[in-house]
Amino acid sequence: RLVGSEMCIRDSTITFDGIRVVIEESSKGVFDVGLFEEMGGEKEAVVKDLTLAGDMTIDAQKREDGYSLLAGSLAGKFKNGCIKNCTSKVDISFADNKGICTLCLGGLVGDLDSYGSEVEVALRGKVINEGNLTVNPCSDAYIGGVIGRATNYGKIFIKENVCVENKGDLTVQWKADAQPDHSYIGGVVGLFKTNETDIEHLHNWGNIRLDTQNTSATFNIGGVCGELTPHNYERIYPLDLYNAGNIEIKHDLLAEFSAIGGVIGSFGGSSFHQVVNEGKIIVSGKGCKYISGLLGSESSIHGNCYLYSCCVDKVGAYPVWNISYHPVTKQVPCKENHPTNQK
C-alpha cells in the first residue's frame, strides 16, 4: 500500500509485471488502486519524467456489497501537486459482474480531486496515456483515457506549456440489467467539473467502444470529455480540444437524455476555441436525439455557451452541437490568431 503526500518522483521507468488486484469482502467501501493509492494532500506531490508500462487487472467479481473504486496506473486519487512529462503504457482491465461498483478509471489517474483555495493541481509538459482500458462489465462509471473524473473546487492548471493526450482504446461493456444512472466516458477525461478556468491542449487518438446491452442508463460520451461543465454559474475557456478517435456504440441508446459528441458529450458555461473533430460516430442500434459532431448536448443548468468559428467538425455527419435551453448560446466569429500544440 503506497500513499504519497509530500514527495517528488522523477526520471524513472516502472514496469507493472502482470499486477492483479482482487477486491473481496471487507469493511472498506472505497478502494484506491494504482502505483500509489493516493497522492497529494496537505503537502503537494510532484511527479516528473516518469514512464509506467505493463498491465494491471482489477477483479471484483467476488465482491457482494456496493463499493467505489478509484483506479489509474499512477494513482487512484491525485489531490494536490504537479504531474509533468509522464507517460503510461499500462493496459488496465476491470471486471465486476454484479454491477455494484461506482468506478472512476483513468489511464493515469482515477480521480483528480482539487478542493480548497490553497490546493493546486497542475499538468505540465507531455502527459500521455498509451495503454488500453477494458471494462467488462460495469453499471456506474467515470472513465477517461487519462483521468476518469476531475473535480475542481481549488485550482487546476492545464494550459500553455502542456499537452494531455490519450492514444489508447477504451472498450466498455455495460451490465445488461444496470440501473438508469448517469455515466461518463471521454477519450481524455470522463467527467470534468471545475471552477472558472482555462483548459488547453487536450487531444485524443484512441477509439471509444461501448456496448450498451440495451440498458436504460444515461451516457455522456465525448472524444475528449464525456462532460465538461462548471460549478454554479462560472465559466470555462477551453482551447485546442482535438479528437481523431472513433466513437462506436453497439446496441441501443434508450435513455432520452444520453449525449454523444465528437469532442464533448454534455457541456455548459463555456467559450470554445479550436475544438476540432476528425473521428466518426458509429451507432449500430437505436440512437438518441443528442448526437453531434462536436458538442453533444447543452446542460439545462450551465448554459450561455459560445462556439467560435475556429471550431470545426471535419466529418460532418451530424450537427456541430445541440442547443435548446439558453437563448444566449450561439456560434460567433473568431478573431484570434491561436497558437496550438495540436499534431
Language model: regions and residue ranges:
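Short, small-residue-biased leader/transition segments that mark boundaries at the very start
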Residues: 1-9
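Extracellular beta-strand/beta-solenoid scaffold signature
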Residues: 5, 22-39, 60-77, 96-122, ...
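Function-dense linear segments that define catalytic or interfacial modules
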Residues: 49-50, 55
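Consensus "Asn ladder" position of solenoid repeat domains
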Residues: 50, 86, 161, 166, ...
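Ankyrin repeat domain, specifically the short helix-to-loop turn at the C-terminus of the second helix
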Residues: 54, 89-90, 130, 164, ...
